[in-house]
Amino acid sequence: MKLKLNFLPYFSFIPKKLNTNSIIFKIIKVFFIAILLSNSIYLSFFENIFTQTISPFLAIWGLVLLLKSKNSKQYFWIGFFVGILWFWWIGLSSIYFNLNYLVPIIPIIIGFIYGLLFRLCYLLKFDFLRLCGIFCISFIHPLGFDWLNWGIFTVYGFFDPSYRGIICIFLIAYFIYEGYISRYYKIAIVLILFFSGFQYNEKQAQTLNLNYKLINTNISQNQKFLQENLKSNSDILIQDILQAINEKKELVILPETA
């Protein structure tokens, strides 16, 4: 007889008397999963060896719990909260266009979009295909912006910051979740995937072999987008570019929103 391997005591810290069918518990559960899938973003504020070590494993835990979600509503709300936790900051730029009311609306819209994408992934019949669908969401790049990039799972920890590391993280989560494999086979598969995705060599920084100039405008954000300042700000940038040309610079790098 094959034995199921229980790697994680999932929600064993929840008191037994708590009604797990209550709406409050379900909201807490999907939000907790979304936090696990977003942990790399927020643990970056507390950089130390401990947080860097556990970060990818928290992401794996989040993927396992996502697979354990057995209805499309849970997938939707996990995607909804992931969208908000990853992109809440996008709405802040509307402040500088006197559109303050859009600050909460924009992340909610983004949350609904990712909620729908996660829900579409649930429509796939098998759990492995659902996980593949979640993985493929990272290839959706509207407006040329690299949105939900699962590569963030490999920013910290032992896994190689490449598709090899990312794929191994997803596969580890799947085989931990999978209940039809015996304990010892499961341990062996997970270990093989771990060492397959391991980063063995430190990545060397690549430098530009160009004579470039980095321009820092030092213009405050609340002044940059005012209509009356557009011409003066543009004139400053043009002067900096012309000066760089006179200095025989091959490349001029401007601030992102210059």
Question: Positions of the model-derived regions?
Answer:
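Soluble catalytic regions of membrane-associated enzymes that act on cell-envelope
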Residues: 202-258
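Membrane-embedded alpha-helical bundles of multi-pass enzymes
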Residues: 2-198
